[in-house]
């Protein structure tokens, strides 16, 4: 089941926008939920691949121009920004694009706190926790870890339950 714009009330409705010009793959029979105020944009020739039991609460922004793979059992808090691109292309003196989109991959069972930013060419390993307010700009290493800004490991050998 896919739920879009949940937790809305008539007095405080946040607009929710989902645009699929590319390919969206929703795997499994579990819950796939995008909260109120989420904005999801999948550009032409891009792929969003969402594993079983995914949930993100309100006001999250997802922009995919190449690929975003989300493993199973991911839970994201509100106010997150996930972008596999820079929003606009930058060209060199030969008119060649110098900032191509680069894919993002979330492993299985990733919990991301509120107001996180995940940018292009990032891999987040399975069984990770991303601390609230973190900005992730590189591939992370290690499972069962809490990561904070710049991919710094805050603690190892941890796990979470919803």
What kind of region is each of these model predictions?
Residues 111, 129, 146-148:
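Short-chain dehydrogenase/reductase
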Residues 114, 131-132:
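Short, hydrophobic/aromatic alpha-helical segments in well-folded domains
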Residues 1-123, 139-141, 150-152, 157-159:
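Flexible, glycine/small-residue-enriched loop-and-beta-strand segment within the central core
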Residues 45, 127, 133, 142-144:
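Tight coil/turn sites that cap or link beta-strands
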Residues 134-135, 162:
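Long, ordered, amphipathic alpha-helical scaffolds
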């Amino acid at each position: 089941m896919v739920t879009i714009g949940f937790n809305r009330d008539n007095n405080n409705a946040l607009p929710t926008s989902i645009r699929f010009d590319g390919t969206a793959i929703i795997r499994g029979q579990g819950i796939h939920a995008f909260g109120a105020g989420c904005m999801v944009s999948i550009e032409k020739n891009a792929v969003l691949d969402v594993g079983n039991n995914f949930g993100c609460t309100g006001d999250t922004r997802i922009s995919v121009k190449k690929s975003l793979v989300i493993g199973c059992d991911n839970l994201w808090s509100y106010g997150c920004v996930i972008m596999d691109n820079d929003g606009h292309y930058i060209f060199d003196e030969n008119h060649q694009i110098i900032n191509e989109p680069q894919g993002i991959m979330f492993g299985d069972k990733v919990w991301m706190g509120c107001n996180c930013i995940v940018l292009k060419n990032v891999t987040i390993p399975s069984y990770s926790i991303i601390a609230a307010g973190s900005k992730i700009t590189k591939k992370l290493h290690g499972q069962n870890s809490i990561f904070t800004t710049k991919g710094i490991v805050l603690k190892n050998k941890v796990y979470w339950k919803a």
